[in-house]
Amino acid sequence: MHPYTGYAGFICGNQVQFDVSRKSFLRVINAFNKNEAAKAFLFANSPFDHMDDMALTRDYFWEYSMHGLLKNNVGIYSEEFQTEAEYCQYQEESAMFYVIRDNCYYYFKPITVKSFFEQEKFAAYSETGEICHFVPKADDFKNHRSYHYQELTKRGTIEFRSTCTQPFETTFAPIAFHLGLLANLVKLEEILESTEFFKEFGRNYSKLRRQFSRKKLSDLEQRMVKDFSKTLLDCAHEALLLRGYSEEKYLTPLYNSLIDDFGVL
């Protein structure tokens, strides 16, 4: 428990942002959207007493919070994007829930971006609870925030935001994992296209994320997700070695986590 009893709660995470080009950002989003099951298995670190079988409940709190009132505002993308137009159309169904006027914040029930800009006027609450009325402005979109696990930011970065806070000694493990896969994107795409993991479990990526967030997996699930994770780790490791900054050392705890009590992957 935290000492700030007047505050509802804190959600922590291990997040990182990397620069991407306009040419590559959709490929990055599509690829990393597909490896969330392995990330759930490798980085789950948010158990909750009332959800006994879940090693990763962080997703639940995001998806069932205010941010998840609109399905397309949080989590894993439900489709693969081929064009910028498709991506923008998807984001039109994500949420607007506040605006800034004269340096003050005003909040309202989440509404899709498309519906927000179709309004002539809207009502919002000030920080003191006063109801105010405003006209939508194009600049309001500058403050738009959706909560997907791979998010394009206005800084021209992709923010990877689905990883739980890690133990202090392994803080850089997920960062190195993301960096290595990003630096080896072509090989990552080839792995995701051919892996036996998806042939066995299908390609409903949201469902797979939940499935491999559980504490107890079947022998088949355990074996397949370990093999998939090991392949992704090798892909990241290869790229980090080529970078020449010794960043691959941060992956060692992840390799160790795949070894069982008998020293077998």
PLM segments and residue spans:
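FAD-binding core of FAD-dependent oxidoreductases
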Residues: G9-I11, Q17, H50
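C-terminal accessory/tail domains of diverse enzymes
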Residues: Y7, K23-N30, K34, A38-A44, ...
